[in-house]
């Protein structure tokens, strides 16, 4: 268990290809780690939909994801729903880079 506020090492920059997403598990919680042209981003690991689909299985286009379970679209950067504003936003988390390493800041 890490101390509160201490960044959690995800991996190395080269571990995640641009335009892709990987699941990252920490303390029994899943996070979706995205590498976009504009940098690294992180959201909760599962969609809020009934299927609770892994967001690491989502389709990515630019800075948006489409849930593989429900088909809803969200901004990866803000977590806001795009095609249905009534939906609950995704939780987003800060990701930092240092010397070729990626860190999740909870």
How would you label these PLM feature ranges?
Residues 57-64, 86-87:
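Short linker/helix segments within small regulatory modules
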Residues 74-94, 99-103:
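C-terminal structural segments of small proteins and small subunits
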Residues 47, 67-70:
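Short cysteine clusters
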Residues 1-60, 92-106:
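N-terminal pre-ligand scaffold of iron-sulfur
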Residues 33, 73-74:
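Hydrophobic beta-strand positions
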């Amino acid at each position: 268990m890490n101390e509160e506020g201490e960044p959690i090492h995800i991996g190395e920059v080269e571990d995640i290809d641009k335009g892709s997403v990987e699941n990252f598990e920490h303390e029994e919680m899943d996070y979706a780690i995205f590498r976009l042209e504009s940098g690294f981003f992180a959201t909760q690991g599962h969609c809020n939909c009934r299927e609770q689909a892994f967001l690491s299985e989502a389709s990515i286009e630019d800075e948006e994801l489409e849930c593989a379970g429900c088909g809803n679209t969200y901004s990866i950067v803000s977590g806001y729903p795009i095609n249905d504003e009534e939906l609950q936003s995704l939780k987003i988390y800060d990701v930092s880079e240092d010397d070729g390493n990626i860190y999740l800041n909870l």
